[in-house]
Structures are given as structure tokens and as C-alpha cells.
Amino acid sequence: KRPVPVTSNLVEIPDELLEVQKDVILSMDGMTVNSLKFLTTISHELFYRTAQYVPTNVASEYEKCMDELMAVYQQGQFQVTEIHCDNEFHKLMDSYSTQHDPPITVNYASAQEHVPRAERNNRTIKERVRATYHRLPYEHLPRILVKYLVMESAKKLNFFPNRHGVSKHYSPRMILHQENLDYDRHCKYALGEYVQAHDEPSPSNTNAARSLDCIYLRPTASAQGGHELLHLQTNQD
């Protein structure tokens, strides 16, 4: 089979739009779906949303999520300068914010209060999760499918321009990644869809199956256009 040619989907964002938004303010919160924990964020002007899976409720896992988040913004040449969050993140953010130069300013909500923008972000993501869940033909979902359902629900909210955002023409994803969507890579298959993956066992002169029964999870970030799948036989992605 011939390899898929790598094509560029880069899009040029006006410099005046990027320069004004270089310093990013985030609202951050935790969210639980079917006992799975996620760290959710939304940027105040770009309206770029994220939902990162947190395997265990320990500081090192949250710091890993924060490092991944900072890398996403830095790759787009943005810098997170301020974070709004609840008091539950006080211990984590006090140590994490000072690791950056200049330090990240952290604004904590008052006692018994929450960050309104972060709460609305959680509510919006959960609405998308419920809508997708009721579209699926399954009565029960494995934990790994729930994990990807939440992460993809947040990611797809970045596909379209936000009416309260900085641009009516450029989506949060386009502004941050400076890349257009590609139908074959990003939209051809839906989460939860039954697919068959091609396998090339080694050695190849056996009666082993050449296709694997899978449930579609999401596209990969590679330029070649790969996909992440849930293998039904092993329940592994």
C-alpha cells in the first residue's frame, strides 16, 4: 500500500490578531465524569478549551497536565501569564507558578466560591458529552471510551469561531495551531463508530487475522493522518 502523502494545512493568521493576544489568561477547574477526573481550562479571549485526563489525584499528575498545556500555548507562540482557579488548587499552583520565568499570576476564588468562567466551561463540555452519549447505540461505555469522549468533546468546541471570541472568522484552534481542519483526517469518522484496522502480523505467513475489530476514538496529531482506536478484543487503545 502506498504511503499517504503529507500535506500542509497551515493557515496564516493576521499578525495584529496574534500580537494583541500574546499574553493568555486561563480559567481552570476540575471535572469528574463517571468517576474519571479531568483538568479543564478555557482561555479568556481566545476561548480555547481543553479537558485533560488525570489518572490519579496526585500533584505530579496535575503538574504533568499543566506542562502539556503550557507547551500547547508556547507552540502557538502564546504565553500563559495568569490563571484563575478554585482554592482546591492552592497548594499545587503555589509551587507550580514559581517554576516559570516570569512567574504565573494565580488568582484564587474566595472561600465557598467558584470561578464562573471555569464553571460555565465545565457545563458546556458536559452538555456536549451528554449529546454524544445519547447518539451512541451502546447501553454501557468502557472507561477508556468515556475518557476519549470527554477529551474530544472539549477539543471539537475549538473547531468553530466563538461568538464571544476575538475573531468571527478564525476558530480558537486555527488561532492557536495556525492550521486548517482536514476532512479526511479530522472529520471522516465519528467517535464510537465501528471500524476495522489493518494489521500486519510478524511473521506474515500465518492464519492470523489481517483486520482488527475496533471502535473509533480520535485522529492522531501526525501529518500522515493516523487514528487512535479501541481494540474490542483486548479493550486497549
What are these regions (language model features)?
Residues 141-144, 204-205:
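Active-site rim elements
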Residues 100-105, 109, 120-142, 156-160, ...:
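Active-site proximal helix-loop segment of RNase H-like, two-metal nucleases, encompassing DDE(D)
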Residues 149-191:
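Active-site-proximal acidic segments at structured loop/helix or strand boundaries
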Residues 60, 144-151:
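Soluble non-cytosolic domains of exported or imported proteins
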Residues 1-127, 174-237:
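Retroviral integrase
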